[in-house]
Amino acid sequence: MPLVRRRSGVYKRGEPNRKKGMPMPQSERSNVNNKNVLSVIMGGGAGTRLYPLTHERSKPAVPLAGKYRLVDIPISNCINSGLRRMYLLTQFNSASLHRHISSAYKFDHFAGGFVEILAAEQTPTTQSWYQGTADAVRKNLIHFLNNDFEYILILSGDQLYRMDFREIVEAHIQSKAEVTIATLPVERKPAGSLGIMQMDETNRITRFVEKPQEAETLDSLRIDPEWYGKLNIPEDREELFLASMGIYVFNRETLIELLDNDHTDFGKHIIPGAIKERQVFSHVFQGYWEDIGTIASFFEANLDAASDLPKFDFYNMEAPIFTHPRFLPASKINGAQIDHAVISDGCIINNAKITHSLVGIRSFIGAGTELNRVITFGGDAYESEESIRKAQADGRPRIGIGENCCIQNAIIDKNARIGNNVVISPEGKEENVDHKLYYIRDGIVVIPKNAVIPDGTRI
């Protein structure tokens, strides 16, 4: 049989390193390990819905819960699942993401792992940037296939959840699937913004509709209440739909074949076509999952970390969330009142009142300041006394939040300089505002990175 060159630049026969050390056939082994699974994390698009947080960074690089980045979630899930071979595909504003990955994830020579960043590039055979999730994977197949693996796990870089990926890969193997999609029961309101599907009694997916908008279409996709027991859904739940989590497991050969075309997106093109022709199965996930796609969802997911019983548990040391070790000192709190708040490493808080807020690393908060439902990203470094004096001489506040400020329902991005007697609140303003000093998105004020808010400003 002659060699056939695919659109991805990959030949069907004679793949790099495929012969030597070729994995055993699926039927001969069912265990999941670092040698037979390769993980690919999608770095995301331009992140327009998270703007201005994505003005200078990619979505996966957006800070999370005080000290982490969004990308730490899928990477930590992989590490906790024993899967240590990861590729991260990036394209937009990726400099800070590259710095974070290179400083946070260094496997030793004996661990058999890596987190390798593959930035979008132009080559003699590829002249365009990534056009979608499937296109990004297609353009990097040549790199993936330099590894021995039977299954490829494709993940999103901007979701909050904790999952043992060995379970979905094991289910994929046991069902003899060609593609397995992680799915989640959701209510009607979010269903219109997700890929919704139906499955039969064997969990094989029989129908898939990307972001259904028509009420009649949604009604036809409802989970039958008789299935609630099988899916471990409480009987009192109503109108549930089976949504794609954007997490996929593909057989190696299946992925190569499905990408032998010019389709650009998994959800819009690849998955609907595969359901008609392939063995595509659902793996139902019952835990907490949040798509951090908008300012509102990002804001609420972060503030939830300060609640009595957070939906996502950062304190679970059986499956910890890893990040860049900064070796910062403990936070110093002088006479402050703090209730339902998360205070990250290295903060200095002087006689402030903080409620239901999340304070990021190296944050400085002056005396008399009140924060209510506020997220601060903190600073990249501590200012020296000389730097503070120079800033004051130039008429700029120091990095952090000054004295006697009142801030509510706001996100303060990194290295922002907020002066004394500043008031920040979205109350009485439009839901979406663009201003030279601030933005309002979904009714939440966002102070951008490196912003300077003078003394006495009222927002």
List the model feature ranges, each with a label:
Residues 5, 12, 18-43, 226-238, ...:
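Left-handed beta-helix
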Residues 88-90, 183, 411:
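Short internal beta-strands
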Residues 47-52, 217-220, 384:
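Short acidic/His/Gly/Ser-rich catalytic and metal-binding motifs that mark active-site loops
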Residues 2-4, 10-41, 49-171, 199-201, ...:
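Conserved N-terminal catalytic core of the sugar/cofactor nucleotidyltransferase
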Residues 118-120, 182, 283-285:
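Conserved beta-strand termini and adjacent loop/short-helix elements that scaffold enzyme active sites
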Residues 63, 183, 198, 249-251, ...:
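Short, well-ordered beta-strand micro-motif
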Residues 84-85, 178, 279:
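Residues at the starts of beta-strands that form the adenosine-phosphate
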Residues 105, 162-249, 261-262:
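Conserved core of the sugar-phosphate nucleotidyltransferase
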